[in-house]
């Protein structure tokens, strides 16, 4: 993952995350990128053109797959401390083993986050988070 991060930085963007998905029996290697001011279609194309020949030699998954490069989107998965830090001030949904929280992310550091809603402020250790994402109110 570190090598992937370094390669992607050559295109002027940051690696947000990557995942392997399976849709309709086909493997998909998804690469999510970010940059200040937002990701353009040209950014995605640059990263795809950079990674494609490398993955032809050293595939990220075994067998046939499709490579997809995109921004993580407005409603995006949060899994790393850096994701939470960059999302302070946004609305989030967080699930731990015991509880679910929805509210505004008011604090984030390497160890924990704080989510505020009408019931109060809830401090949650990042290690206890099973699933988290940003969301928009419509």
Swiss-Prot record:
Gene Ontology annotations for the cellular component aspect, listed alphabetically: cytosol
GO BP term (any one): ribosomal small subunit assembly
Listed InterPro entries: Ribosome_maturation_RimP (IPR003728), RimP_C (IPR028998), RimP_C_sf (IPR036847), RimP_N (IPR028989), RimP_N_sf (IPR035956)
Compartments it resides in: Cytoplasm
Major localisation: cytoplasm
Taxonomic superkingdom: Bacteria
Key words of the record: Cytoplasm, Ribosome biogenesis
Keyword Cytoplasm tagged: yes
Family per similarity comment: Belongs to the RimP family.
Matches recorded under NCBIfam families: PRK14639.1
Described function: Required for maturation of 30S ribosomal subunits.
HAMAP family named in the record: RimP
Protein name: Ribosome maturation factor RimP
Origin species: Campylobacter concisus (strain 13826)
């Amino acid at each position: 993952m570190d090598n992937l991060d370094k390669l992607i930085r050559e295109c002027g963007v940051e690696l947000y995350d990557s995942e392997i998905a399976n849709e309709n029996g086909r493997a998909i290697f998804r690469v999510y990128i970010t940059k200040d001011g937002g990701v353009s279609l040209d950014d995605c194309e640059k990263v795809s053109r950079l990674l494609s020949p490398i993955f032809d030699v050293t595939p990220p998954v075994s067998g046939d797959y499709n490579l997809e490069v995109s921004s993580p989107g407005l409603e995006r998965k949060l899994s790393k401390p850096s994701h939470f830090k960059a999302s302070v001030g946004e609305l989030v949904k967080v699930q731990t083993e015991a509880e679910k929280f929805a509210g505004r992310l008011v604090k984030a550091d390497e160890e924990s986050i704080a989510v505020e809603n009408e019931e109060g402020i809830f401090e949650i250790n990042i290690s206890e988070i099973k699933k988290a994402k940003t969301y928009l109110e419509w």
